[in-house]
Regions:
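The serine-hydrolase catalytic nucleophile loop
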Residues: 56-68
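Conserved alpha/beta-hydrolase
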Residues: 72-91
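Conserved acidic catalytic loop of the alpha/beta-hydrolase fold
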Residues: 102-119
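Conserved hydrolase catalytic core segment
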Residues: 118-155
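Hydrophobic, aromatic-rich cap/lid helix
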Residues: 187-210
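Short beta-strand/loop motif that positions the catalytic acidic residue
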Residues: 217, 223-225
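Conserved loop-alpha-helix segment in the C-terminal half of the alpha/beta-hydrolase fold
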Residues: 227-252
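Catalytic active-site module of serine/aspartate enzymes centered on a nucleophile-bearing elbow/loop
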Residues: 250-275
């Protein structure tokens, strides 16, 4: 019960962040590996930087409303920011058993084929960062990794408390149960254009990356988490598992760290360091 109440509060806080809205770029589409239609923003010119948003959000909420995408584009990069499968303008309401394994990571492989250009960097926040890890693992893309809002629990397949809370909220919403968590996730879906069925599928298709595989990563990696963010484990501990990875501490919780000005500043500094 406490976990569900906390989830409702977190989702409500995230909804308040929409007050910082800035206009997002128009969206384009591509056909993914299984012909699903995925929508994405494309803004700026320069080396490609893919931005992957968090669970139950969309690219606009995560990257454009806080102004992060615009700042990266202004720094001389081509920002590609998809609405991930089952979210926002990329609806996918198949039942969980019909979601392909690693679907969101495989969508990014199809995206790079569509663009005809490998990314200079892939950056993700929360679920987007988990997907960025999987994208690198499956493709062995040589671009940089910027991973926000995740820690060492992404390597622990048994650490499912957070997923369980989200799943319970979604199932309450689908069943019409009037719980605080269900109300919060329904409000979130309405605000971002998502669906509960899409969210449920995304949770079901999520795959962890065990520590022995993290140890094989050989690209520059930056880990960023808020000083009060332990939602996905320890950021410094994750950095210690990836060879050569660096850690930057932000101010805030899992949700509020995305509006810390230090986030885009650290991302741009990392991007520039490789040019």
């Amino acid at each position: 019960m406490i976990r569900h109440a906390a989830l409702a509060l977190l989702l409500a806080v995230f909804a308040l962040l929409t007050a910082r809205a800035e206009e997002a770029a128009p969206m384009k589409t591509y056909a993914s590996f299984d012909a699903a239609t995925i929508s994405y923003h494309d803004v700026g010119t320069g080396p490609v930087v893919i931005l992957l948003h968090g669970f139950s959000g969309n690219a606009d909420l995560n990257w454009f409303q806080p102004g992060i995408a615009q700042k990266i584009a202004a720094a001389g990069y081509r920002v590609i920011a998809p609405d991930l499968r089952g979210h926002g303008a990329s609806p996918f309401d198949a039942p969980p058993e019909r979601w392909p394994a690693d679907a969101i990571a495989r969508d990014q492989i199809a995206l790079t084929a569509h663009l005809g250009e490998a990314p200079y960097a892939t950056a993700g926040y929360s679920m987007g960062a988990i997907s960025a890890l999987r994208f690198h693992l499956l493709s062995r893309n040589t671009g940089r990794l910027i991973l926000g809002g995740i820690g060492d629990s992404v390597a622990d397949e048994n650490n499912t408390d957070r997923n369980t809370a989200f799943r319970a909220a979604i199932e309450d919403g689908l069943a019409g149960r009037d719980t605080p968590a269900a109300k919060a996730i329904l409000a979130r879906a309405r605000a971002t254009g998502g669906t509960l069925q899409g969210y449920l599928g995304a949770l079901s298709a999520r795959t962890y990356t065990p520590a022995d595989l993290l140890a094989t990563f050989n690209v520059p990696a930056l880990i960023l988490t808020g000083h009060e963010d332990l939602d996905n484990g320890s950021g410094p501990a994750l950095a210690a598992r990836i060879p050569g990875a660096r850690y930057t501490r932000l101010t805030g919780t899992h949700l509020t760290a995305v509006i810390d000005p230090a986030l885009p500043a650290a991302m741009i500094a990392d991007l520039d360091s490789g040019r």
